[in-house]
Structure formats: C-alpha cells, structure tokens
Amino acid sequence: CAPENVSGLVYGGIDVVSLANNHILDYMEPAMIQTQNILNEAGIAHSGSGMNSYEAYLPTIKSIKGQVIAFLASSDRTGQYNNYQPYLNAGENKSGFAYMTPYYIRQQINSVGSFADLIIIEMHAGSEYSHAPGSDYDSISRLEDFRNMKTNPASLIGFQMTPDQESEIDDYSWRLDRPKLWDRAIRHFAIDEGADLVVVHHPHIIQGLEVYNGKLIAHSLGNFIFDLNYPETYPSMILNSKADESGFTEF
C-alpha cells in the first residue's frame, strides 16, 4: 500500500487505528516505523505495535465531549502455533504487536481503568472465513476455567498458572502460550475485566454481534476496504453507536 493512500483514511474521517495485526512486520521494522510516522503526520492515532512490548501495549487516549475513551489493541496471530518464525509479537527487546492473552488483556485494562470513562478493545484474532466465532478448542469446563483465570492457554502443553487477582505471575512466559484462546471466551473475559466494547478483525467476513452482560461484542465486521476475490468477503459493516457516561448504547 503506497504511503500516500493514508489520504483515504483522512478523507474517510478515521481518527484511530489498530496496528496489532499479523501483517505489521511484513516488511520488517523500517516499514512498521514508516507506517507509524505516516499516521502521526496525518493526525491518526494508533496503538498495538512498537519497537518493544512496552510501546506495543500503550493505549490510545481520546477525550471526546468530556468523555475519556481508551483504545486498547492486541492480536494473537503470532505464528507460534505453526512455528512460523520470526514470531510477530513484541518482546522486551523485539518489535511487533501487542500479544493478546487473558493475562495481558487484564494488564491493559487495569492500566487505564482508573481514568478512562470508556474502554474499547480491538482484537485481531479469530478464524478466517468462518461465519461464526469459536474454535475446536471450546469446551464447557475449559470456558469456565478461562473465565475464572484458573487456566492459562499454556496449560494445554503442561504449563499451569493459578494467579489470584492481585498476585504477580513469576513463572509466566509468553513463549509457552498458544493462540487457542476460545474466541468467545476471551472476548467475554475482556468485558468481565472492564471493557465497554470489543471489536474484532481478522476473519475477513462478517460474523455475529453479541450483547454480553449489557456490552457489545462485534465478532467481525468484515473487510471494509480490504478487497479479496471471494464472494463471502464482499459484505462489510460499519458499527455506529452512541456513548455516554453509562457506556455505549443504540448500536
């Protein structure tokens, strides 16, 4: 995509974008930095990528009509599950995107919870070309453990963590995670932790809208302007909503 195409985003009124996706390092660090700089020059805020994990997890904060809105972005499309290297998630001394796990979602939400009136989480995740969220890893017991933070995804390969709400996880390692995160469960978890709206992209086609505990989850809005030669990818949606101090309404 040519850098000058950012003018289309400006013309379309785009104010905030997520850079947490599996293509952010397609042309390595120089292209990621160029992308960030072009967006900065165009006045478009972004989150979800960085030269290290600290930068990648930083939120975008917007104050709109007296409401402070935090935009959090992350992805689980690291390449670890197929051993596609180099992995795409950022690390302590490695560029990439913010890695999406229950542990890090909780940390992201906690980092803005004290001052943000509304929290939007953008997730680049899910099954491509699937019309409904979910995966082969869903099970009733696993979903319940997931919601209670009793089981880390890494426990699927023998690594277990059982943190309480306030404790530090000394033996936690992202290297042991796998992105089998039970699509609906991790989105429910984000709402339970304090998110007001969850928007998901990556499947390339429209998936369902779900209201969970009074909060909306858009499981996939389609491609918007990402053209593919598959008829099922042609439809797309724009999500409209009003917001006040109580949250997002009138979807």
What positions do the PLM features span?
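Acidic, metal/ion-coordinating pockets
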Residues: 1-251
